[in-house]
């Protein structure tokens, strides 16, 4: 008889895959000339995976890892967009000089054995 599965094992594995995907996404963005400002920024009611800057543009980046790039692309729903928007507003409140830059919400989609897909302006930041 098999012992009962560790209930937290799946959560830990998913978390680990997410961290790996974020690291890969950051590498891809840095190769494109972006400079990291923050990683896994959390504020009340929201979280942003990556905050990067290139020139006068700051991008709040949501990273999604799925079995296929298409599945990753459909994983950013209205609730996730709202959470990223809340966190972006909180980050801007802490960094007022950033308001003088171009702000956008990007996405990076990650799938096994595929080059990550960066989608600039993937969605609107609510309330900006």
Curated annotation (Swiss-Prot):
Q: Which HAMAP family match?
A: UPF0102 (MF_00048)
**Under which name does UniProt file this protein?**
UPF0102 protein Mchl_0439
Superkingdom as given in the UniProt entry: Bacteria
Which organism encodes this protein? Methylorubrum extorquens (strain CM4 / NCIMB 13688)
Q: Where is the signal peptide?
A: none
Q: Which Gene3D superfamilies match?
A: 3.40.1350.10
Q: Identify the PANTHER family for this entry.
A: UPF0102 PROTEIN YRAN
- State a single Gene Ontology molecular function: nucleic acid binding
Q: Lineage of the source organism?
A: Bacteria, Pseudomonadati, Pseudomonadota, Alphaproteobacteria, Hyphomicrobiales
Concerning its family, UniProt says:
Belongs to the UPF0102 family.
């Amino acid at each position: 008889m098999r012992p009962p599965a560790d209930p937290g094992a799946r959560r830990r594995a998913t978390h680990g895959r997410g961290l790996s995907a974020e690291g890969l996404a950051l590498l891809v963005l840095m190769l494109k000339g972006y400079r990291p400002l923050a990683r896994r920024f959390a504020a009340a009611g929201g979280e942003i995976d990556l905050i990067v800057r290139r020139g006068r543009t700051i991008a709040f980046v949501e990273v999604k890892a799925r079995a296929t790039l298409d599945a990753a692309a459909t994983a950013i729903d209205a609730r996730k967009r709202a959470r990223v928007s809340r966190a972006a507003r909180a980050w801007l409140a802490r960094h007022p000089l950033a308001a003088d830059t171009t702000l956008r919400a990007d996405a990076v989609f990650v799938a096994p054995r595929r080059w990550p897909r960066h989608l600039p302006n993937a969605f609107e930041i609510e309330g900006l």
